[in-house]
């Protein structure tokens, strides 16, 4: 589950891979038990949690550096912040293999699981089947992935092009849920693709099994593979630096980045879970652990905010941050000199959840990407794909995470991503922009008084997509009925300049408008309809979600009137077909190179 990112070490790693190469090596595909509860890992003998030193897993992920800092390192330290919170010395152990974590969890070596919300959902059925004591309780969100993970493919432009393709993903890893989300939003199921699994998330020299065990290596070596879920450095290598792979220097010919979690920024949620029996016996200790880690996140967030001030940053504080990050760079990037890379990973490619994020994730049942919604979505998809036999929802600890539980913290104002309508349109039409998927909905006959309450399902779906793809441009397209345009074009092609219409029982002649006039009118009408949807969405956020204007960012919306340029039916022959032409579309457009970053490498030097 190693998701190390952003190193300027990337070119060194690429060199090592090209020298050591995967040419001619066998790809070791892994099977995944269906349902997963039949996996041999669930045959592990159940044991009580061992007393004394508390074993706590971490994974190769920047946010876990905060956990290590709170413990004063990986070794047991009763006097550390984390040790005091846990009421016992805590030994932090890197366990990137989820199966290994599950064995320790079941046997009682550790009461904790460290994974993503998708991974916890995958294991919940098997753990609960052993004993209700093992049912996982998710008690903390650490972070969101906001650039570290993604998907790469050849022969794919939109996500719907994945139908019939073969893709490779790490078995039981964080990318399984990313693949599920991409398929769902493309209107596909697991049955529409062939999924192959490998043991590692990236090349792992410590894997004792010779051959290729990672998605990038499989994509490179197996010509039947069309795409892979991978970490960002691997995506860059596979696509010749984020463009299109040529087949040289470990790239795959024709491969290009489809998206990363910079676009799909609310998909991969990293969490901690605890055994039900241990939580029942130690609720205050679990809450104290979570609170201490979130307080440590607040400390790190303060340092990241200082970096984001760029030239105005407090230089003494910047030096302090780099100094405390040195050992973390050594642990996660195997080089203490790679401090800037670690900070970029922590502050750009991931997003610390903080107290406010945990309150939102666990406490807001209306959130389309929160704990309740994520569990429901993941479980439904896993059941449909045969990965679980019945829905077994993980529970949440449901702590209150206001920093002062008696006084709610006022919501912070949201910083707009784009400065103007012109800027978001330029991003949507840039050469690097890519349409990922669309959602089509019908327009009512009159848009002047469009109210979201009349179309709650439409606006709930819009909100889900807008929130999940927090780094994308959201284009609202309006389409008009083309019947009158077709009629005028036909009449004009025959040389007509007038049209007869029945008025008051008698036919009268009227001047026939120019085709361009009809097209322009349709463009204006369709734009006004699309804009009415944006206006109604803002109303939905205010009234259904209780957001103020300062808490909304509508700058990512690009409103576009398509007029009659893209009809669903070019020659509508029924009222139903005319209605289907008069539609709205929500288009999610990836524009990763156009999204401004909070800071860059130059701000750390």
Give residue ranges: language-model regions:
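Short, glycine-/small- and polar/acidic-enriched structural segments
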Residues: 25-210, 215, 219-232, 258-260
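Pocket-lining segment of extracytoplasmic ligand-binding domains
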Residues: 117-119, 128, 196-328
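Bacterial N-terminal signal peptides
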Residues: 8-18
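Secondary-structure end/capping motifs
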Residues: 280-389
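Periplasmic peptidoglycan-binding/anchoring modules of Gram-negative envelope and division proteins
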Residues: 443-505, 534-542, 586, 594, ...
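Periplasmic OmpA/Pal-like peptidoglycan-binding modules at the C-termini of bacterial envelope proteins
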Residues: 409-431, 487-489, 501-523, 528-605
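N-terminal hydrophobic or amphipathic helices and topogenic motifs
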Residues: 20-106, 343-429
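Sec-exported extracytoplasmic/periplasmic mature domains
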Residues: 69-72, 76, 106-110, 125, ...
């Amino acid at each position: 589950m190693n998701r190390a990112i952003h190193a300027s070490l990337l070119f060194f790693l690429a060199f090592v891979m090209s020298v050591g190469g995967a040419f001619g090596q066998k790809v070791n595909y892994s099977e995944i038990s269906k349902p997963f509860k039949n996996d041999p890992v669930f045959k592990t003998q159940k044991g009580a949690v061992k007393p004394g030193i508390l074993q706590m897993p971490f994974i190769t992920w920047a946010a876990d550096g905060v956990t290590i800092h709170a413990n004063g390192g990986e070794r047991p330290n009763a006097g550390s912040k984390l040790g005091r919170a846990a009421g016992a010395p805590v030994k932090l152990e890197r366990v990137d293999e989820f199966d290994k974590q599950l064995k320790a969890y079941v046997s009682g070596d550790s009461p904790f699981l460290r994974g993503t919300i998708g991974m916890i959902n995958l294991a919940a059925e098997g753990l609960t089947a052993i004993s209700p004591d093992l049912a996982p309780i998710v008690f903390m969100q650490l972070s969101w992935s906001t650039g570290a993970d993604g998907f790469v493919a050849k022969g794919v432009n939109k996500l719907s092009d994945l139908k019939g393709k073969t893709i490779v993903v790490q078995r039981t890893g964080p990318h399984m849920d990313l693949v599920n989300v991409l398929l769902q939003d493309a209107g596909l199921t697991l049955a529409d693709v062939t999924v192959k699994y490998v043991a590692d998330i990236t090349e792992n020299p410590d894997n004792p099994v010779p051959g290729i065990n990672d998605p990038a290596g499989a994509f490179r070596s197996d010509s039947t593979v069309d795409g892979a879920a991978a970490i960002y450095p691997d995506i860059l290598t596979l696509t010749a630096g984020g463009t299109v792979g040529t087949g040289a220097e470990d790239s795959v010919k024709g491969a290009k980045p489809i998206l990363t979690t910079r676009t799909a920024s609310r998909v991969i949620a990293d969490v901690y879970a605890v055994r039900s029996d241990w939580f029942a016996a130690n609720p205050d200790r679990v809450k104290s652990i979570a609170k201490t880690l979130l307080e440590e996140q607040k400390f790190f967030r303060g340092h990241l905010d200082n970096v984001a001030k760029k030239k105005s940053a407090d230089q003494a504080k910047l030096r302090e941050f780099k100094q405390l990050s040195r050992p973390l760079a050594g642990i996660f990037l195997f080089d203490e000199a790679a401090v800037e890379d670690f900070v970029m990973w922590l502050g750009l490619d991931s997003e610390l959840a903080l107290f406010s994020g945990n309150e939102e994730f666990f406490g807001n049942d209306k959130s389309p990407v929160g704990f309740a919604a994520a569990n429901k979505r993941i479980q439904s998809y896993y059941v449909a794909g045969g990965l679980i036999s019945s829905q077994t929802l993980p529970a949440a600890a449901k702590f209150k995470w206001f920093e002062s539980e008696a006084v709610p913290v006022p919501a912070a104002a949201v910083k707009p991503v784009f400065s103007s309508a012109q800027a978001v349109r330029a991003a949507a039409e840039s050469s690097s922009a890519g349409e990922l998927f669309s959602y089509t909905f019908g327009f009512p006959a009159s848009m002047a008084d469009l109210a979201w309450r009349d179309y709650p399902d439409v606006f709930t779906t819009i909100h889900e997509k807008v929130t999940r793809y927090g780094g994308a441009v959201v284009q609202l397209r309006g389409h008009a009925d083309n019947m009158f345009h077709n009629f005028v074009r036909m009449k004009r092609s025959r040389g007509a300049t007038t049209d007869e219409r029945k008025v008051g029982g008698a036919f009268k002649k009227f001047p026939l408008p120019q085709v361009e006039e009809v097209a322009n009118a349709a463009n204006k009408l369709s734009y006004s309809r699309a804009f009415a949807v944006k206006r109604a969405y803002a109303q939905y956020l205010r009234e259904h979600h209780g957001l103020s204007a300062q808490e909304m960012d509508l700058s990512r919306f690009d409103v576009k009137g398509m007029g009659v340029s893209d009809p669903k039916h070019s020659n509508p022959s029924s009222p139903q077909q005319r209605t289907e032409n008069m539609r709205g579309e929500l288009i999610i457009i990836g524009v990763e190179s156009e999204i401004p970053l909070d800071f860059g490498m130059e701000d750390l030097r």
